[in-house]
Amino acid sequence: AAPKQTAITAPQDIADYIFAHGTLPDNFLTKSEARQLGWDSSQNYVSDVAPGYSIGGDKFGNYEGLLPDASGRKWYEADANYTAGPRGAERILYSSDGLVYYTSDHYQTFTEMHPSGK
């Protein structure tokens, strides 16, 4: 059997994976995928139905305009530093054209991420 993949949860590790592959690591599920496994945010935790997985890949509206906008750019979000229990306030936001940002305070402030070592 293949060795169990280590879940990628740290903000810089998630960002580096996105920079390298253009997508989230395999340990992320969209909200819809998690719901299909039995997740209900009012009744249980993601870790109850999908241990080792985090929520990520859903569209982020950027309605407040706090992230850079460009024609055709789409934004997506992913939980950061999630291991179990309730989802925290940390998120990674990544764009369809290669930008990555981190928020530690649930979309109040954002820090642009860069590949490790750059």
Language-model features: locations:
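Generic detector of bulky aromatic hydrophobic side chains
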Residues: 7-8, 17, 26, 60, ...
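Functional cores of ribonucleases/endoribonucleases
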Residues: 35-118
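Short, solvent-exposed linear motifs at loop/edge-of-secondary-structure regions
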Residues: 22-41
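Low-complexity, glycine/serine/proline-rich disordered segments
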Residues: 1-23
